[in-house]
Amino acid sequence: MTVIKQEDFIQSICDAFQFISYYHPKDYIDALYKAWQKEENPAAKDAMTQILVNSRMCAENNRPICQDTGIATVFLKVGMDVQWDADMSVEEMVNEGVRRAYTWEGNTLRASVLADPAGKRQNTKDNTPAVIHMSIVPGGKVEVTCAAKGGGSENKSKLAMLNPSDNIVDWVLKTIPTMGAGWCPPGILGIGIGGTPEKAVLMAKESLMSHIDIQELQEKAASGAELSTTEALRLELFEKVNALGIGAQGLGGLTTVLDVKILDYPTHAASKPIAMIPNCAATRHVEFELDGSGPVELTPPRVEDWPDLTYSPDNGKRVDVDKLTKEEVASWKTGDVLLLNGKILTGRDAAHKRLVNMLDKGEELPVDFTNRLIYYVGPVDPVGDEVVGPAGPTTATRMDKFTRQMLKQTGLLGMIGKSERGAATCEAIADNKAVYLMAVGGAAYVVAKAIKSSKVLAFPELGMEAVYEFEVKDMPVTVAVDSKGESIHATAPRKWQAKIGIIPVES
């Protein structure tokens, strides 16, 4: 009989979530570096460079890979011979471990979980509760998988109830472009096929916990070995999704996915459920077993596991944002790399909602946005002598509904975020001769190092969603939508899809 002690289990959960906050899995590092080596689009290669450099910096400094340190997801396989030496339930122990991990002062993680999601949406302050999936299996061990999944990729999850005769590849290739770049490619696609709707979604999520092995599968196919249905489907989807030319951060390029994972399950004769969930550039998961001998001891990657890369945007144009004018903004073209210097404002979902409500009521805003740039970000709290914790961009499309009003009524000159903007937002940018700049998702620590001072200007009660003023030095961004409304996320993938030449570009 295996006895698992309460404190050993709690501490193992805590250590696991701290561990994955700053260590990429080695298989992800290896796969991304191989993609970097073959990438031909300079913009996409630049983005991957930032992600790889950021990854190594986070590992060396034990700070989060991404400012969105995710919602905690835990898969448990509990052996039937396991006995618990505990006063708390398994769910309570998991949540205590998550609480410790996210509130540890040595590496504070961002609390992103909100209670009462349909109502007040109040932050729980410690990132609990976790999402827990538990099964009872034979044996005397507890198998644990801990994953932290950010909102940018989770929000791009898809579920469809296909007809039995529908083609899975066609559905995936039709769906991927609708997901935009908010899931921070290059990453991994997890697909669940069969069962019931909720089973398909769970399989899609669980598939993402397995190691990247697409190259081994390619070698198996090349050897002439027989492939299973799911293996053949993985290879076909891997080739064709990358042939869409979406590329790193949606900038166009050769690699959009590093692997495609598939789990399936028997389903009803009338049904063909399919779910798809992407894993982002901040891929974070770890697996371990507890056998009663004590808490887990996780082995960190070696520094040598990371490629010896440096990030230096020598082609960037330095911009003094304190003296920014519409005339200067009008001179920028999509794809231009800029290095921002001066003071920028921040604000995301909750702040924008408040600001627009104030505008609707004719109230004076707490901040003057005239000729300013606003950065869509919710930073991690600083530790030690940091000015701010990791502070990468959040998905800009969530602010689309506010953009025209903000540009028209506040004098705002530009925005900084990640991913594409919708067609109506691009029109609003053109109508107001504004600009949208893109920072790299998955490079939060790199961005934080460019922030030299930080102070809250408005809505401090919103925590990470408050309006800050950051003073930045050489903060790297790319012009994603210029003052004419042209979007790099609309033009670049089509260009690279045509260049790859596997899937015809629709006119």
Regions found by a protein language model. Give the residues of each.
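Short, charged beta-turn/beta-strand-edge "cap" motif at the junction between a beta-strand
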Residues: 337, 343-347, 483
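Short, structured beta-strand/loop micro-motifs enriched in basic residues and often containing a Trp
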Residues: 314-324
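Short, well-ordered loop/turn sites that connect or cap secondary structure elements
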Residues: 329-332, 338
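Residue "hotspots" at secondary-structure boundaries inside conserved domains
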Residues: 327-330, 367
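Short, solvent-exposed amphipathic alpha-helical segments in soluble enzyme
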Residues: 162, 204-208, 275-279, 292-294, ...
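Feature captures the catalytic cores and cofactor-binding loops of soluble hydro-lyases/lyases
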Residues: 208, 212-252, 346-475
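C-terminal binding/interaction regions
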Residues: 252-260, 267-268, 281, 303, ...
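Non-transmembrane, aqueous-exposed alpha-helical and coiled segments at domain scale
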Residues: 1-312, 406-408
